[in-house]
């Protein structure tokens, strides 16, 4: 589950209108099939971490420094996050696919974090791939943060679009700034 609405300042049009709450669950079991994790990539870019922060809240150290009222909410530099995502997400995907020992063209779907449809389209273009391989559901739910990939994966399964043996790349990115991709054989 991911709940970002609690951390957004209601009058901040740069965050409050973008983030929503969502939850999804995926059951993973050993069913005797050859489904497996084939490759992964995880990268952090702390030097740009202030571009997307969760803000300070009651769950943090109560004995720490006093914080300004302004820094208690999620804050985002949308332009910086867009530039980060459109540069680093394709790199992460390429590295994970290479680690998996397959080609980009072997991937049936790239299940990306649903932060922004423009980011998804730009990543597809940078990888020279059709948007048909990049399902999008942000128009239904908004940005549900960490829940967006499992929600999209569950929808693909429910729609009968996934079959045993399909190669999938699941990619998330966000605060920190961080990006991660895992390539699986479904």
Name what the model sees in each region.
Residues 1-2:
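Glycine-rich anion/phosphate-binding loop at the beta-strand->alpha-helix junction
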Residues 5-10:
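Short, solvent-exposed loop/turn segments at secondary-structure junctions
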Residues 11-83, 87, 91, 173, ...:
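Condensing-enzyme catalytic core mediating Claisen C-C bond formation in acyl metabolism
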Residues 57-108, 119-128, 152, 156, ...:
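Conserved active-site "lid/cap" helical segment
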Residues 90, 108-186:
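Claisen-condensing/thiolase-fold acyl-transfer catalytic domains that form or cleave C-C bonds
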């Amino acid at each position: 589950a991911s709940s970002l609405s609690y951390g957004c300042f209601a009058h901040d049009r740069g965050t409050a209108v973008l983030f929503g709450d969502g939850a999804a669950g995926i059951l993973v079991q050993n069913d005797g099939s050859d489904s497996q994790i084939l490759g992964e990539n995880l990268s952090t870019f702390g030097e740009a971490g202030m571009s997307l922060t969760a803000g300070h809240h009651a769950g943090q150290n109560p004995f720490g420094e006093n914080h300004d009222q302004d820094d208690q909410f999620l804050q985002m530099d949308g332009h910086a996050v867009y530039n980060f995502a459109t540069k680093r997400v394709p790199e992460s995907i390429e590295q994970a696919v290479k680690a998996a020992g397959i080609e980009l063209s072997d991937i049936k779907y790239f299940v990306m974090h649903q932060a922004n449809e423009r980011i998804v389209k730009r990543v597809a273009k940078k990888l020279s791939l059709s948007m048909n391989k990049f399902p999008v559901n942000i128009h239904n739910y908004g940005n549900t943060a960490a829940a967006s990939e499992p929600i999209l994966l569950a929808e693909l399964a429910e729609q009968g679009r996934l079959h045993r043996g399909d190669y999938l790349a699941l990619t998330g990115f966000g605060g920190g700034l961080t990006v991660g991709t895992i390539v699986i054989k479904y």
